[in-house]
């Protein structure tokens, strides 16, 4: 077995919940999902995110393998609000005069995002489809050379259109 096969095997075991012991004191997925739902409902009430359409229940034929009893199958859209970023027109240099971090997929590092080299201003937020993502947002590169790269915001930031954000 080569290093890549070993890595893939370990990841597969982790996804199936077979890598570490499941402890009752850690709680269940159902409890975590209830907490996420309460927080999401509060964000909707505070008008920080929009209410999303309910997703269909997961059917038996969609389940690829068994998971621990304390886990739960769910759709990615159920864990948060997803949205793509935007790139303000470079024909408006005033959009880039400010101190609001603007992340591109090349800034994703599969870790925490604490520093972003490019910025936009309040005008860009007001006049374009840019959204300010809160601390804790999970970012993912959707296409291009960086597809699949991830990051978790440790600062509030906006993103370009090649990046989607999940606000848990």
Predicted regions and their residues:
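Short, intrinsically disordered, charge-balanced linker/junction segments flanking boundaries
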Residues: 72, 166-168
């Amino acid at each position: 077995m080569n290093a890549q096969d070993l890595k893939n095997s370990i990841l597969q075991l982790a996804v199936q919940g077979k890598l570490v012991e499941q402890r009752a004191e850690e709680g269940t997925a159902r409890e975590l999902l209830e907490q996420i739902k309460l927080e999401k409902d509060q964000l909707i009430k505070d008008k920080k995110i929009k209410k999303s359409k309910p997703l269909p229940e997961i059917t038996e034929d969609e389940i690829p393998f068994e998971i621990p009893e304390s886990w739960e199958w769910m759709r990615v859209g159920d864990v948060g609000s997803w949205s793509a970023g935007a790139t303000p027109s470079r024909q408006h240099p005033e959009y880039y005069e400010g101190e609001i971090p603007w992340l591109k997929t090349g800034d994703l590092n599969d870790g925490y995002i604490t520093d972003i080299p490019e910025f936009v201003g309040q005008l860009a937020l007001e006049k374009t489809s840019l959204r300010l993502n809160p601390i804790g947002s999970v970012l993912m590169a959707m296409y291009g050379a960086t597809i699949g790269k991830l990051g978790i915001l440790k600062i509030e930031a906006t993103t370009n259109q090649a990046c989607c954000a999940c606000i848990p």
